[in-house]
């Protein structure tokens, strides 16, 4: 199957995980949420730099706490038969070699982090974020241009907005993960706001 055309992506078509997995590796990110096909272009450098900074901070803490494994896109998360997503950064609980090799499905992530950019902000905010919440997954939306992080708890209809420090309190951890935001923005070359 080639890149989706208008007929394949006709209104009312319900995309499955299998449909998305059959799409080509052409530089676009293909996901489906509740059967809707989401296509995002390759990300900008700023997006990837922020992803890298968040990944590095989370990974160091998760490894030290021994609570799981941190992965990043294009790794896939399958939530159900009509929901395949590629979160920018996500934390899985401890998994074995069978999950890491793909022999068995991965459990739901403990945390998902999506970095907003012009090509994906609408999908991340309006499609993926509510889907994560319905699956019981905490979601952070990182807005580098506004230099803030929105924390969406699984049972919340409004985010907790943080501009200085973001914290995460997973059940299995002996202490919370905290990430100062100013060093992240500085690392990726953004001027200080406020």
Model-identified regions with their sequence ranges:
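Gly/Pro/Ser/Thr-rich low-complexity, intrinsically disordered segments predominantly at protein N-termini
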Residues: 1-194
């Amino acid at each position: 199957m080639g890149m989706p055309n208008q007929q394949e992506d006709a209104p009312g078509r319900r995309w499955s995980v299998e449909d998305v997995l059959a799409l080509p590796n052409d530089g676009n990110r293909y996901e489906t949420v509740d059967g809707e096909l989401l296509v995002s272009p390759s990300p900008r450098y700023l997006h990837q730099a922020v992803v890298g900074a968040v990944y590095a901070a989370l990974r160091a803490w998760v490894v030290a706490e021994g609570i799981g494994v941190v992965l990043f896109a294009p790794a896939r998360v399958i939530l159900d038969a009509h929901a395949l997503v590629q979160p920018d950064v996500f934390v899985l609980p401890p998994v074995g070699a069978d999950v890491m090799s793909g022999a068995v499905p991965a459990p739901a992530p403990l945390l998902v982090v999506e970095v907003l950019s012009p090509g994906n902000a609408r999908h991340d905010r309006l499609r993926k974020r509510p889907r994560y919440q319905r699956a019981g997954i905490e979601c952070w939306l990182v807005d580098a241009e506004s230099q803030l992080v929105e924390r969406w708890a699984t049972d919340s209809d409004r985010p907790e907005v943080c501009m200085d420090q973001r914290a995460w309190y997973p059940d299995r951890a002996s202490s919370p993960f905290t990430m100062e935001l100013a060093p992240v923005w500085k690392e990726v070359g953004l001027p200080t706001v406020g």
